């Protein structure tokens, strides 16, 4: 199954709230016992130098991610996305991917090739 979920919520008084889509996806994937979660964005994945696509980090272990944040490799909007990836893996999702959704067939390339095209988070 591929759940499609709106991340807009409301409270008892009818107030409307924007719920972080990455947080929602991580929680849903963990609750479903998903083997994988794919986050499609407008960047190739986590890069050592955000301006140099050749520095893409193909695999990040959950234990390595805090160092990458502290050292500034992971910065800005990628910090909460990384946090969600780590939370999903630590909650039982085997693999979490960040891939560039602008690339045609990005999901197929990531899932069906040995090298992939994005960054994969795994436990470790």
Q: For the regions a protein language model found, what residue spans apply to each?
A:
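C-terminal catalytic "cap/lid" subdomain
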Residues: 1-124
């Amino acid at each position: 199954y591929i759940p499609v979920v709106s991340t807009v919520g409301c409270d008892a008084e009818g107030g409307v709230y924007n719920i972080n889509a990455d947080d929602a996806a991580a929680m849903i994937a963990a609750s479903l016992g998903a083997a994988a979660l794919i986050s499609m964005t407008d960047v190739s994945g986590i890069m050592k130098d955000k301006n140099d696509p050749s520095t893409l980090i193909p695999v990040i272990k959950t234990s390595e991610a805090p160092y990458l944040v502290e050292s500034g490799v992971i910065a800005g909007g990628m910090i909460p996305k990384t946090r969600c990836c780590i939370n999903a893996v630590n909650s039982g999702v085997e693999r979490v991917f960040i891939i560039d959704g602008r690339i045609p067939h990005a999901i197929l390339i990531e899932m069906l090739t040995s090298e992939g095209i994005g960054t994969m988070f795994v436990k470790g």
